[in-house]
């Protein structure tokens, strides 16, 4: 779990969050539209839509934006988005998984390939690196819901697999297939979660030096800046000394 926490800290470094937030609402809206189009436009009858709305609210997305994204799914002229996963290698032999929602597979594939190549990486085939990750459910709560013991007890009762607590919150991990069931069970003891989502968690992390870490961060930043890219995951780790420099 340490790798998850470290990667999160690096990606949340100063100055980067403003750049990410500028595109966050459009990415969240796209997920809401896709979720609404895949099932009923009612979050009570559509688990994926309910989670998408929940995650959007956690990022302070205005209600008008959320409603507009749902209505867009019902429009006859609305775009059809495909869910695509790309897998590749970054500097130092690190593994990277990219999740995208796109209305043009050729455009997105070309953009992602170009980003990998310019950063000294290489785009691989589907399945080339995902075997070294676990696809799991992640449910997050703010620290205000209770201490680590309370959250651990609630997580065990709900059928979760693990809990990590740091200075920013509680992170509960469960099987991907049980995400909806576990998140619903947690609500009785902890209330509504801040975020509920599926993530790719590295089984083992690859140590890299400061130079390679900086190259990797530029690669990941470029991927996240692409309008079609929803999520990026990697398996690199750095020393505490390098982490302090990168997070500054």
UniProtKB/Swiss-Prot annotation:
This protein's UniProt keywords: Cytoplasm, DNA-binding, Transcription, Transcription regulation
Membrane-spanning intervals of the chain: none
SUPFAM superfamilies cross-referenced by the UniProt entry: YebC-like (SSF75625)
One Gene Ontology term of the molecular function aspect: DNA binding
Broad class of where this protein is predominantly found: cytoplasm
Single biological process term from Gene Ontology: regulation of DNA-templated transcription
Source superkingdom: Bacteria
Compartment(s) where it occurs, according to its Swiss-Prot or TrEMBL record: Cytoplasm
InterPro entries: Integrase-like_N, TACO1_YebC-like_2nd/3rd_dom, TACO1_YebC_N, Transcrip_reg_TACO1-like, Transcrip_reg_TACO1-like_dom3, YebC-like
GO CC annotations on file: cytosol
Gene3D superfamilies given in the database record: 1.10.10.200, 3.30.70.980
PANTHER family, sorted: TRANSCRIPTIONAL REGULATORY PROTEIN YEBC-RELATED, TRANSLATIONAL ACTIVATOR OF CYTOCHROME C OXIDASE 1
UniProt record similarity statement: Belongs to the TACO1 family.
Protein name per its UniProtKB record: Probable transcriptional regulatory protein Rleg2_3214
């Amino acid at each position: 779990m340490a790798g998850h926490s470290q990667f999160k800290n690096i990606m949340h470094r100063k100055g980067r969050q403003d750049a990410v937030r500028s595109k966050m609402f459009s990415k969240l809206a796209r997920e809401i539209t896709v979720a609404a189009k895949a099932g009923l436009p009612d979050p009570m009858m559509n688990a994926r839509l309910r989670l998408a709305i929940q995650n959007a609210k956690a990022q302070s997305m205005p209600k008008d934006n959320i409603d507009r994204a749902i209505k867009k799914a019902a429009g006859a002229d609305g775009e059809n988005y495909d869910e695509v996963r790309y897998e590749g290698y970054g500097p130092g032999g690190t593994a990277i998984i990219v999740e995208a929602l796109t209305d043009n597979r050729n455009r997105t594939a070309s953009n992602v390939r170009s980003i990998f190549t310019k950063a000294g990486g290489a785009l691989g085939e589907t399945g080339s690196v995902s075997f070294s990750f676990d696809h799991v459910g992640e449910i997050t709560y703010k620290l205000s819901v209770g201490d680590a013991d309370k959250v651990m007890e609630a997580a065990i009762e709900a059928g979760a697999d693990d809990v990590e607590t740091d200075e920013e919150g509680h992170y509960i991990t469960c099987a991907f297939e049980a995400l909806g069931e576990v998140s619903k069970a947690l609500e009785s003891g902890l209330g509504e979660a801040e975020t509920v989502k599926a993530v790719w968690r590295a089984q083992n992390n690859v140590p890299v030096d400061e130079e390679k870490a900086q190259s990797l961060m530029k690669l990941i930043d470029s991927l996240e800046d692409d309008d079609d890219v929803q999520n990026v995951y990697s398996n690199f780790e750095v020393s505490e000394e390098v982490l302090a420099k990168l997070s500054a």
